[in-house]
UniProtKB/Swiss-Prot annotation:
Note: Cyanobacteria usually contain more than 2 copies of the psbA gene. 2 of the reaction center chlorophylls (ChlD1 and ChlD2) are entirely coordinated by water.
Annotated site, Tyrosine radical intermediate, chain positions: Y161
EC numbers: 1.10.3.9
Species for this entry: Synechococcus sp. (strain CC9902)
Topology within the bilayer: Multi-pass membrane protein
Family: Belongs to the reaction center PufL/M/PsbA/D family.
Protein name, per record: Photosystem II protein D1 2
Record function comment: Photosystem II (PSII) is a light-driven water:plastoquinone oxidoreductase that uses light energy to abstract electrons from H(2)O, generating O(2) and a proton gradient subsequently used for ATP formation. It consists of a core antenna complex that captures photons, and an electron transfer chain that converts photonic excitation into a charge separation. The D1/D2 (PsbA/PsbD) reaction center heterodimer binds P680, the primary electron donor of PSII as well as several subsequent electron acceptors.
Binding site for [CaMn4O5] cluster: D170, E189, H332, E333, D342, A344
List of residues binding Fe cation: H215, H272
Cofactor remark: The D1/D2 heterodimer binds P680, chlorophylls that are the primary electron donor of PSII, and subsequent electron acceptors. It shares a non-heme iron and each subunit binds pheophytin, quinone, additional chlorophylls, carotenoids and lipids. D1 provides most of the ligands for the Mn4-Ca-O5 cluster of the oxygen-evolving complex (OEC). There is also a Cl(-1) ion associated with D1 and D2, which is required for oxygen evolution. The PSII complex binds additional chlorophylls, carotenoids and specific lipids.
Entry's Gene Ontology BP terms: photosynthetic electron transport in photosystem II; response to herbicide
Annotated coiled-coil segments of the chain: none
Cellular component terms (Gene Ontology): photosystem II; plasma membrane-derived thylakoid membrane
């Protein structure tokens, strides 16, 4: 009899746990994806904070020239970063137990892999949790589809790009200046600014910001008046009220006269679909562009200069971009025996544009 009671108690505890995990009445929904998300994001956050503050220098290039990224080694909030794992490790999975000692693991940049892998699993689980909560509430699943855009971008810079380049040392450092360094080197090696998918991403981000600002300002400027002319319109509303607070017909009429009639939406669902789809599709394309450039399918280049009848170079903006890219690439490649191939294999290139003779 005692054994039977214990089994029922165990089953009841598990059932209670399942109900708590999947309950939509909790202040914060957990969900089964949340069971995976919470520990992975906690592990990534804790390791990131400790590494950002106190990690020793990392031999990122694999040439015994460690690069310091933590605050305790002289960096500040702007210059600090969790430095990517060493080029000597390459694409090998490098958990703590693969190193001979903790010092070796830190020297080869093991914390970077720990943070990135747990972070990626965490954001994948967060996306699944968005779908799970939508499913429990009977909603449509497009929230997690929209979130897939930044997830794809993070996957591109932290996972796909290192795979394509052959080493996690080429991944984006986890810091402010490290992000800028990654962007400069990416431009130097892949000419990302001349890649059409990056252009679509820029249009998506800036266009999305513009449309969001236009929509928000238009809605808050076309309130349905519930007060007299002598009172503020704001007094006619309560936060979270069920009644509609603005008139989309009035907003449509205003915007149609400001631009032209068919530039404005008269259907709220179409409008909000557009507001969601524009930046999401743009960021999808950027992630796709980074993922293709990871395997050196680069942006357009203008390596052939324009020449006049005597064979002299007519310097154009393309030449300026090329020289800037070569300069960034030289600064990046601190390793003498890993000199940029487009410099080492070609004829010498003048560093500056030709200046006219003075006097």
């Amino acid at each position: 009899m005692t054994t039977t009671i214990q089994q029922r108690s165990g089953a009841s505890s598990w059932q209670s746990f399942c109900e708590w995990v999947t309950s939509t009445n909790n202040r914060l929904y957990v969900g089964w994806f949340g069971v995976l998300m919470i520990p992975t994001l906690l592990a990534a956050t804790i390791c990131f904070v400790i590494a950002f503050v106190a990690a020793p220098p990392v031999d990122i290039d694999g040439i015994r020239e460690p690069v310091a990224g933590s605050l305790m080694y002289g960096n500040n909030i702007i210059s600090g970063a969790v430095v990517p794992s060493s080029n000597a490790i390459g694409l090998h999975f490098y958990p703590i137990w693969e190193a001979a000692s903790l010092d070796e693991w830190l020297y080869n940049g093991g914390p970077f892999q720990l943070v990135v892998f747990h972070f990626l699993i965490g954001i994948y689980a967060y996306m699944g949790r968005e779908w799970e909560l939508s499913y429990r509430l009977g909603m449509r699943p497009w929230i997690c589809v929209a979130y897939s855009a930044p997830v794809a971008a993070a996957s591109a810079v932290f996972l796909v790009y290192p795979f394509g380049q052959g080493s996690f040392s080429d991944a984006m450092p986890l810091g402010i200046s490290g992000t800028f360094n990654y962007m400069l080197v990416f431009q130097a090696e892949h000419n990302i600014l001349m890649h059409p998918f990056h252009m679509l991403g820029v249009a998506g981000v800036f266009g999305g910001s513009l449309f969001s600002a236009m929509h928000g300002s238009l809605v808050t400027s076309s309130l349905v008046r519930e007060t007299t002319e002598s009172e503020s319109q704001n007094y006619g509303y309560k936060f979270g009220q069920e009644e509609e607070t603005y008139n989309i017909v009035a907003a449509h009429g205003y915007f149609g006269r400001l631009i032209f009639q068919y530039a404005s939406f008269n259907n709220s669902r179409s409008l909000h679909f557009f507001l969601a789809a524009w930046p999401v599709v743009g960021i999808w394309f950027t992630a796709l562009g980074v993922s293709t450039m990871a395997f050196n399918l680069n942006g357009f280049n203008f390596n052939q200069s324009i020449l006049d009848g005597q064979g002299r170079v007519l310097n154009t903006w393309a030449d300026v971009l090329n020289r800037a890219g070569l300069g960034m690439e030289v600064m990046h490649e601190r390793n003498a025996h890993n000199f940029p191939l487009d410099l080492a294999a070609a004829e010498s290139t003048p560093v500056a544009l030709q200046a006219p003779a003075i006097g």
